[in-house]
Every structure is written in structure tokens, then in C-alpha cells.
Amino acid sequence: MIDLQGYGPRLLEGALVTLEVAVLSLLLALILGLLTASAKLSRHWLFHRIATLYTTLIRGVPDLVLMMLLFFGGQIGVNMITDWLYYEFDVDIFININEFIAGVVTIGFIFGAYMGETFRGAFLAVDSGQLEAGRAYGMSNRLIFRRIQFPQMMRHALPGLGNNWMVLLKTTALVSVIGLSDMVRIAAEATKATHEPFLFMIPVAVVYLLIASVSEWIVARLQKHYNVGFGEADEWNN
């Protein structure tokens, strides 16, 4: 392992933290994205309005501002609630929100909106006639979703999901501003102590590039999997 003036092991730990934040944020964003897409496609006006407000908020407010608002505002809100609950007992309780959890929730919340738009477009791209044909054959809604809608939806969604993941990966650098010791924060601390920015920032850039390269390979494999059979079908249609 490269020692990097004693900061090598800490940078490796920071890289693992960055990867954990990215993966967990992605999982949360995918869940929120599916819920948002379902709400936007719903005929229920309230669900549609809430989803529209959510995506508009995320598009209009910078990620860094949202990170600060959710972390510090959430901490203030939680402590206000505990003060109210324990007011009669004259107990002073102060709760610190974990930086890791705050980072995952914030990034997942931000990218849930973008994933929602990606999923919505992908669902709309699936031919509704195929869904009607599935119902005509007596298939349940769950089976139609699993066998017909989901595979075709993923075919259309994967390029957008891959792009969102790449942006999400780079956005994880923002967690350093709330005190989480990811590799960006550790590299910044090492730079401040040694006055050698390139010695630490270049390895950080290399790690991000490695993760991005592996991610591109995974997305390409998934696209190949979900595109099986569609090339031949397109040739027949032409």
C-alpha cells in the first residue's frame, strides 16, 4: 500500500466510506424513484401533486444547500421534538444526527427525484398494448409487471439510471461538509497538514475513476442482458 506520508490507510478507509455512502444512497434513490414515478403516473391528484412538488424542489435547490438544510435543519427539528416530549420531566436531551446516515438520506432523497423522472419516462415507453394483451391472457397485474413491463422498462431506464449513478457518485464528495470522514475530507485534511495537494487529490481522483469505470462495465452488461431479443424484433419490424 502507498503510505502517502502516513495518510494511506486513512484514505483507504475514506474510500470505503465513500463507496458505502454511494451504494446505500443509490438503493434509497431507486426506491424513492419508483415511488415517485408511480405517484406521477397515478390518477390520484394528491399523489401526483406531492411527486411534482418533490421533483420541482430538488431541481430548483442546489445539492449543497439541501445537504446543509437537511443535516442541520433535521438536527434542530429532532431536538425540538425531544424537548417538547420531555418538557414535563425537566430533562435536557441533545441528539446528534449521525453524519453517515444524514449523508445517505440526503443524497438518496436528492437523486430519488431524478430516478423518478427516469423511471416515469421508461414506464411510458412500454407499449400499453402489450399490457392489455397480458390482461387478455388472464395474467395478474403482478405477473404482467414482472414478465412484461419491468424487463422492457429497464431496457429504457438503464441509460438514464447509469448517468444518474455517475452524478450521484461524484455528489458523495459533499458529505465532507457535514463532517463525515470520506476520502475527500481526509485528503483535504492531509493537504492542509502537508501543503501537498497533488499527492492526495490525485489518488482520490483515481479512485473515483476506477469506481466509475467498473460502474460503466456493470451498466453495459445489464443493458446487454435487457436488450436480448429486441435487436431481432427491431429488424423484423423494419
What would you call each of these model-derived segments?
Residues M1-N238:
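Transmembrane alpha-helices and adjacent helix-loop boundaries
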